Amino acid sequence: MNYLQLPKIDLHCHLDGSVRPQTVIDLAKIQGIDIPSDNVDDIKSLMVAPESCPNLDEYLTRFALPVSVMQTEAALERVSFELFEDAAKENVKYLEVRFGPQLHRKQGLNFEQIIGSVVKGMHRAEALYDIKGNYILSIIKVLPKDDINEVIDAGATFLNKGVVAFDLAASEEPGFCHEYIPYAKYALDKGYRITIHAGEQGVGQNVYDAISLLGAERIGHGIHINNHKDAYELVRAEAVALEACPSSNVQTKAVENIESHPFGDFYRDGLLVTINTDNRTVSDTTMTKELQLAAEKFNLSEQDYFQIYKISVENAFASDEVKQSLLKFIA
């Protein structure tokens, strides 16, 4: 397989984990922000997580630097544009990017400005490149809950014009879904689709709860359903797609190593699995790299890959028109 040339779809990619290191330097200069170095290799080393982190929380420390310079409309628009540009150049045909609007208010932007800026950057890239995209709004679970509905309201203005879904992200505690039932319902009532980070850090029950309590149609990661029979069967029965991120899952110790990742078993058992980057910079990866890793480690043929691509199309939060156009790339 020519991994670079193959058409690709990425349904699980974080904006603040996919910023170009040089852009962090540029934005810091423009905004007069002190950063540890103006050497791109030094900055990259602060943004890329080690191949093996002790846990997810250690991995998440790599986001502080890019977020510090993503506090203006121009910065958000640029970072969004560049992510879509980078993806388009490796034949990603459709990209869903998630980000937490709550993280970008340090210089006084409101949620409409924050969301509008990233959508604008995406639309600029769509006009220049053969790529389509949408945004997912991630609620950061470690932050106060009092402005969650405000985020949902602000995003509703952009629903189906660049924003499509609601997500919960950040470190994963057992039983977290119970606290977010009213917020997920509020988002659903507004017309959002739902995908939830769950089952990344060893808690299969969280996947069960995300589907049964929050209405999740997709699950971010979900790998620990392999030790929770009820969650596994619910994922199958409800045809819930799993957003697998192989490199990231090894880095965060969600799995011990790539050989122990359940992706191949899930695929062969008929679960709806997809291949995604998670964080292009923090995991120092691309869709090309993730596809090659998955193909080689899980013994996927080109036909297998086309089947996974179709699963990604069918479970994308895209319009029917966009889905039809995406299927033409493998016709």
UniProtKB/Swiss-Prot annotation:
Any Pfam family matching the protein: A_deaminase
Protein name, as recorded? Adenosine deaminase
Native organism: Shewanella halifaxensis (strain HAW-EB4)
Q: Which family does it belong to?
A: Belongs to the metallo-dependent hydrolases superfamily. Adenosine and AMP deaminases family. Adenosine deaminase subfamily.
- Site (Important for catalytic activity) location in chain: 221
Cofactor binding note = Binds 1 zinc ion per subunit.
Q: Which domain of life is it from?
A: Bacteria
**Tell me, what is an example of a GO biological process annotation in this record?**
inosine biosynthetic process
Gene Ontology terms: cellular component: cytosol
**PANTHER family tied to this protein:** ADENOSINE DEAMINASE
Q: Where does substrate bind?
A: 14, 16
Q: Which cofactor does it need?
A: Zn(2+)
Using the UniProt record, name the top-level EC class of this enzyme in a single word.
Answer: hydrolase
InterPro entries annotated for this entry? A_deaminase, A_deaminase_dom, Ado/ade_deaminase, Metal_Hydrolase
Which gene does this sequence derive from? add
Q: Where does Zn(2+) bind?
A: 12, 14, 197, 278
Describe the task this protein carries out: Catalyzes the hydrolytic deamination of adenosine and 2-deoxyadenosine.
Q: Name one GO molecular function term.
A: zinc ion binding
Q: Which reaction does it catalyse?
A: adenosine + H2O + H(+) = inosine + NH4(+); 2'-deoxyadenosine + H2O + H(+) = 2'-deoxyinosine + NH4(+)
